[in-house]
């Protein structure tokens, strides 16, 4: 980095573990910031060093839980009031992204509201990864650098040296993402068509494609309760798959996800570290995205191309 004094990296409570890795990759210290929590549940943010005239990068995933979003908004507000030259929100996991449209009457569009809140608070740029819906980028009137976890997942899949490999998606909605993987690796694509009884409950699932005697890698963006991904794995094995493993960008893993993954037929469940995972599940593995975000920050500071590096 040519001028380390021209930018500073700070972190909210939720993503400090990742921010420390990003700073280690950049070769810069993590900025000193204080978040004070009060007895009534409110909290306040203060920067413990000057950020006047600096490009300020704020690392914080906005969910889970909702306090992380409010914490980020206060970080943005404090940076603006402290005369930062520019404020860049680095949101590895953009919470509320599954609320990206009206899918029935009289419902909120949470992703648009969060975009508005961040914009009004004062960010000049957003760096995020694997949005649940690409069109969320259009909710902002500022530059959005949309990174892809495929940059870390594809080398990992290649390192497994799996024969008779197929890429699969646990639902038709993820076919575009899975298709990118299958084309890059030069292997077949298999789809699962699911129906839901209600939220987080999968009723039926059918396979579109051949998995007999294949090593299957399921590709998804978010694993929440793990109902879909584990059911897909079971259906694949019942159809004659040799092995099934899964990769997903964001490790939400709400209860009873850890139990479901542990008891499932999945060989492993691989995530990025966009969200910390503290629960015990031997099958869960996390690959770090710190170097990818660090390189993106470096390119933003130096006005270099980002898309040429990360979009495949």
What does each model-found stretch correspond to?
Residues 1-312:
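PRPP-associated nucleotide enzymes
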């Amino acid at each position: 980095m040519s001028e380390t004094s021209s930018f500073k990296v700070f972190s909210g409570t939720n993503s400090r573990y990742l921010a420390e890795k990003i700073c280690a990759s950049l070769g810069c210290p993590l900025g000193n910031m204080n978040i004070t929590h009060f007895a009534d549940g409110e909290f306040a943010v203060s920067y413990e060093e000057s950020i006047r005239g600096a490009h300020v990068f704020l690392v914080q995933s906005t969910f889970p839980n909702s306090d992380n979003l409010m914490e980020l908004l206060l970080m943005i507000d404090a940076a603006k009031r402290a005369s930062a030259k520019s404020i860049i929100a680095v949101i590895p996991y953009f919470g509320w992204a599954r609320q990206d449209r009206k899918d029935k009457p009289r419902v909120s569009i949470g992703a648009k509201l969060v975009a508005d809140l961040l914009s009004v608070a004062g960010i000049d740029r957003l760096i995020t990864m694997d949005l649940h819906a690409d069109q969320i980028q259009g909710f902002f009137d500022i530059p959005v650098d949309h990174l892809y976890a495929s940059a870390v997942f594809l080398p990992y899949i290649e390192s497994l040296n799996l024969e008779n490999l197929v890429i699969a998606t646990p639902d038709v909605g993820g076919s575009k993402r899975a298709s990118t993987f299958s084309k890059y690796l030069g292997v077949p694509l298999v789809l699962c068509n699911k129906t839901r009884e209600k939220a987080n409950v999968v009723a039926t699932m059918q396979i579109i494609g051949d998995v007999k005697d294949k090593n299957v890698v399921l590709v998804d963006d978010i694993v929440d309760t793990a109902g879909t991904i584990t059911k897909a794995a079971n259906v694949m094995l019942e159809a004659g798959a040799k092995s099934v493993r899964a990769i997903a960008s964001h490790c939400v893993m709400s209860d009873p996800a850890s139990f479901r993954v542990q008891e499932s037929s999945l060989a492993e469940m691989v995530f990025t570290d966009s969200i910390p995972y503290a629960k015990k599940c031997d099958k869960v593995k996390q690959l770090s995205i710190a170097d990818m975000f660090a390189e993106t920050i470096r390119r933003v500071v130096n006005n270099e191309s980002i898309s040429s590096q990360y979009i495949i």
